[in-house]
């Protein structure tokens, strides 16, 4: 809400009356920025849990909204709240939000929360650049953040995303237009070429972040298969075409079962399968977030694992003796591909000898049976 007020205050600044500006600014400070300062410790009775070791969407969204609000009123705020807050949010976002991207580019929560997190990250850095001329190191605080667009490309199948964890079928919490922004900031035009034709592209940020001078096809010389090796995530994406809605697509994961901001499932070995325009093996997605203990913890005895959609039996994964996988699982993986890439044409027939594989040793997930 603070972000929305910030945009309205800034973009319509020349038409607001003095009283209107004062009222809007007062509301932003009282119901947004003051609470942000309290969350950072000014009020010891206020708990801002999202600021501490929260490498994910909450940190990105909260810091982004507070930063946008502070920047919008910085020149008018005589209370000092805006400048005080900027001294807190930027460094915190660099230490937390930016670190949600793993060493291989994966978003460490889930494919769905990539949307929330990267939108917050992009809005925050874009606002800093627009208002001050600098992002203060946010874009490069994590040296591999630029790889996260690749994560989004490969986790997108012909019918839907590889929607593991807390993520319902086609549940888009916002758009992927951060891809347009990252294409410019990281000089990776392929990200914008991928996003510009997606169904979620027509929304306001595309007007500001899309560079209409880019040309080409995102799939031109883009490998069909890609593997993400960070031990936290460990997953692979394999397909027969980038442009055929009837293409074969298989995505499979191993990875650790803790450290995903309590948005993961007990799902080492989980997979999805698309073919002939249909998802034949899919995901159940999120449960009811209001359910008792749903976000209690990712410990072995967590109430979260009592819910069918979160426990092992609710996944496309192996069940042994009816037991959940161990949260301490540390799978090892092997993978390979013959390395085909699609050319510039939308018509592509994968060679008959094309092959890709992803295997995982899941023994550590079943040490309890």
PLM segments and residue spans:
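Catalytic core of carbohydrate-active enzymes
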Residues: 250-347
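Short, charged N-terminal helix-start/capping segments
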Residues: 20-58, 190-202, 280-289, 293-312
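Carbohydrate-active enzyme catalytic cores, enriched for enzymes
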Residues: 49, 73, 113-279, 346-351, ...
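Long, amphipathic alpha-helical stalk/connector segments used for oligomerization, subunit docking
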Residues: 336-369
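Generic structural "secondary-structure junction" signal
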Residues: 109, 164-166, 320
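Aromatic-lined, polymer-binding surfaces characteristic
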Residues: 1-156
